[in-house]
Swiss-Prot record:
Keywords from the UniProt entry: Cell inner membrane, Cell membrane, Membrane, NAD, Quinone, Translocase, Transport
EC number: 7.1.1.-
Cross-referenced PANTHER family: NADH DEHYDROGENASE [UBIQUINONE] IRON-SULFUR PROTEIN 2, MITOCHONDRIAL, NADH-UBIQUINONE OXIDOREDUCTASE 49 KDA SUBUNIT
Taxonomy of the source species: Bacteria, Pseudomonadati, Chlorobiota, Chlorobiia, Chlorobiales
Enzyme class, spelled out: translocase
Subcellular localization: Cell inner membrane
Reactions catalysed, as given in the entry: a quinone + NADH + 5 H(+)(in) = a quinol + NAD(+) + 4 H(+)(out)
Membrane topology label: Peripheral membrane protein
Gene: nuoD
InterPro entries reported in the protein's UniProt record: NADH_Q_OxRdtase_suD, NDH1_su_D/H, NiFe-Hase_large
Function: NDH-1 shuttles electrons from NADH, via FMN and iron-sulfur (Fe-S) centers, to quinones in the respiratory chain. The immediate electron acceptor for the enzyme in this species is believed to be a menaquinone. Couples the redox reaction to proton translocation (for every two electrons transferred, four hydrogen ions are translocated across the cytoplasmic membrane), and thus conserves the redox energy in a proton gradient.
Species of origin: Chlorobaculum tepidum (strain ATCC 49652 / DSM 12025 / NBRC 103806 / TLS)
A cellular component annotation (GO) from this entry: plasma membrane
Gene3D superfamilies the record matches: Cytochrome-c3 Hydrogenase, chain B
Molecular-function GO term, any one: quinone binding
Record-given protein name: NADH-quinone oxidoreductase subunit D
Length: 400
């Protein structure tokens, strides 16, 4: 086979020196190609399909196609009692079931206008923050493996297993907990709850720092995420972004601070946002940094809750749970800060039925994913993997 000669390159064309007849014009009007990613592609984190229109290796447009995991959540809610909806919320963002339950329960409690015991409030926050850390570990670990780093994935799932064991010990389930109930909890925590949770905090704090250094000081990981998929703050706000996605664009917005609920107003913690020293504000690396730093803040919250949680022997966590829930006629919107952003519920009651007339779930994953067109435009095809991973979607919540 004849060896190709060296190429002489300028801004508009590439010319092979050994054959003057061959001239490739880089600015030719070539035909676009349609590339389908998913719905079984590993980097889509579930049954998501992206239809990408490409010009060579450059993405012109990426359109998400949803609905493969649709399970009629909102329609089911109209046919079952208020307490029976709690297990259904677990199955939306199945990586953060405690947070889903908390958002739903505080919405119904707002409609019922009932007060929750302080011990219950502190327990709710502790399990929600444990679940937040577990969710972020999945996000960081799978993001690392998407970009070719296998070891951090193993580290993340090793540490997540400690949290899964704790939550199983508390609630009886590893994932779909059905633990936070309207007006209380399914069970009070075991006797040595404080000791075991405190031991986990002590164990995990140095691990969180190690994980932070493992990726943010990795040259390959930084090159794959730095200055990729930039979302300006004003565009992120217009899209309705929330959670680590919005904070990654430099907006210091966290419902635990800006619209506090439960006992969060009593707790001292920071809301991490990128400062532009290690990343371009709004890029994939910024979104990763926010999640990595948030785990330390969750540990601070858990420690404070352990100190402030009142000791009440023979405490009945179901004492204030109504036997039959039939709220007065009206409508209410409640929301909470989930690991992926704002999860909200809009509930309408007719005052007669034990089921809601309407239960609308506001999914942060769906809203964040809606910006995929803007995020991917002009990026290279391999960078789509980095962009999708930085959004950290769960298709169970996107489709519902």
């Amino acid at each position: 086979m004849q060896e190709l000669g060296k190429a002489e390159t300028n801004s508009t064309r590439i010319i092979r020196q050994d054959d003057k007849r061959v001239t490739i014009e880089k600015d030719l009007d070539t035909e676009h190609m349609v590339l389908s990613m998913g719905p079984q592609h590993p980097s889509t984190h579930g049954v998501l399909r992206l239809e990408c229109i490409t010009d060579g290796e450059v993405v012109v447009e990426a359109e998400p196609y949803l609905g493969y995991l649709h399970r009629c959540f909102e329609k089911h809610c109209e046919k079952i009692d208020y307490p029976a909806i709690v297990p259904y919320t677990d199955r939306m963002d199945y990586l953060a079931g405690m947070n889903n339950e908390l958002a739903y329960c505080i919405t119904v409690e707002k409609l019922l206008d009932i007060e929750i015991p302080r011990r219950v409030e502190f327990i709710r926050v502790i399990v929600a923050e444990l679940n937040r850390i577990a969710s972020h570990l999945v996000a960081i670990g799978t993001y690392a493996i998407d970009l070719g780093a296998f070891t951090p994935f193993l580290f993340c799932f090793r540490d997540r297993e400690h949290i899964m064991s704790l939550l199983e010990w508390i609630s009886g389930a590893r994932m779909l907990y059905n633990y936070i109930w309207i007006g209380g909890l399914a069970y009070d925590v075991p006797a040595d709850f404080k000791t075991r949770v405190a031991e986990f905090v002590t164990y995990f704090r140095p691990k969180a720092k190690e994980l932070y250094q493992l990726l943010t000081e990795n040259e390959i990981f930084v090159k794959r995420t730095y200055d990729i998929g930039i979302m300006p703050a004003d565009v992120a706000i217009n899209y309705g972004w929330s959670g680590p996605m919005l904070r990654g664009s430099g907006v210091k917005w966290d419902l635990r601070r800006n619209d506090p609920y439960s006992v969060y107003p009593e707790l001292d913690f920071d809301v991490p946002v990128p400062d532009g020293k290690f990343s371009v504000v709004g890029d994939c690396l910024s979104r990763h940094l926010v999640r990595a730093l948030e785990m330390e803040e969750s540990l601070k919250i858990i420690e404070q809750c352990l100190d402030k949680m009142p000791e009440e022997p023979n405490f009945n966590s179901r004492a204030l749970i109504p036997k039959k829930i039939r709220p007065k006629a009206g409508e209410v919107y409640g929301r909470a800060e989930n690991p992926r952003g704002e999860l909200g519920y809009y509930i309408v009651s007719d005052g007669k039925s034990t089921s809601p007339v309407r239960c609308k779930a506001r999914s942060s994953c769906f809203v964040n994913l809606s910006a995929m067109k803007d995020l991917s435009k002009g990026q290279l095809i391999p960078d789509l993997v980095a962009i999708i991973g930085s959004i950290d979607i769960v298709l169970g919540e996107v489709d519902r």
